[in-house]
A protein has these predicted regions:
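Short amphipathic
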Residues: 8-16
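Rieske [2Fe-2S] iron-sulfur-binding domain
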Residues: 22-125
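Basic/polar N-terminal segments that are highly enriched at the extreme N-terminus
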Residues: 1-4
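Tryptophan-centered short beta-strand motifs
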Residues: 6-9, 43
Length: 126
């Protein structure tokens, strides 16, 4: 988790906006963010663009039974738990810190200049 000095907490939704087993796509300071309300009450927030070709993940498939977000373009898959790449492995989504304040859902936007939209580049053999 980030310290309060390293992030700016930004409200992205309320608990009434997103029920368990649902998701939202929102824009936060010019970046697309996908907010996922897992069954059981946990909330996860990730970059909202696929790291492959920057396709909006909310346009893909969000499968709560499998716990997987699938990009609509090339079917890259990511874990809803931590944003790690499942297909292909080795890629990942930027994961925002999340906090609840009453009914509000807040995400921690890094203040240290860290890139909040990760890209995956394939390395070619020489």
């Amino acid at each position: 988790m980030s310290s309060d000095e390293a992030v700016k907490w930004v409200k992205v939704a309320t608990l009434d906006d997103i029920w368990e087993g649902d998701f939202l796509d929102v824009e936060v300071e010019g970046e697309e963010v996908i907010v996922v309300h897992l069954r059981g009450g946990e909330i996860r927030c990730f970059q909202g663009m696929c790291p492959h070709q920057e396709i909006l993940l909310a346009d893909g498939k969000v499968d709560f039974d499998a716990g997987i977000i699938t990009c609509s373009a090339h079917e890259w898959q990511f874990s809803m738990e931590d944003g790690s790449g499942l297909n292909p492995r080795g890629c990942k989504l930027f994961r925002y810190d999340v906090r609840k304040a009453g009914e509000d859902i807040l995400i921690g936007v890094p203040l240290d200049g860290r890139l909040r939209r990760l890209r995956h580049h394939f390395q070619q053999d020489a």
